[in-house]
Curated annotation (Swiss-Prot):
Keyword vocabulary terms for this entry: Cell cycle, Cell division, DNA-binding
Pfam families: CedA
Sample GO molecular function, one term: DNA binding
Domain of life: Bacteria
HAMAP family: CedA (MF_01580)
Assigned protein family: Belongs to the CedA family.
Annotated GO biological process: cell division
NCBIfam families: PRK10113.1
Physiological role: Activates the cell division inhibited by chromosomal DNA over-replication.
Protein name: Cell division activator CedA
InterPro entries membership: CedA-like_sf, Cell_div_activator_CedA
Length: 80
């Protein structure tokens, strides 16, 4: 007899970007990019959405982080 899989009725959690209050103190702002900060050797974008910041995943190149930020901004403009 096969063991039943545990937690069959567990709901699937979809990815929701974390809302950060602001870039942390130890993040270093990159002057060349509008939304990109250096965080632990990776590039992270913070985009202000209304009252709070949305934080991107960590990227290894700043251009990717900025592209993410631009996309989030565009999507938000469409949603409004």
């Amino acid at each position: 007899m096969m063991k039943p899989l545990r937690q069959q009725n567990r709901q699937i959690i979809s990815y929701i970007p974390r809302v950060e209050p602001a870039p942390p103190e130890h993040a270093i702002k990159m002057d060349a990019f509008r939304d990109v900060w250096i965080l632990r050797g990776k590039y992270v974008a913070f985009v202000l959405m209304g009252e709070s910041f949305q934080r991107s995943p960590a990227f290894s190149v700043p251009e990717s982080a900025q592209r993410w930020a631009n996309q989030v901004r565009q999507e938000n403009e469409i949603a409004d």
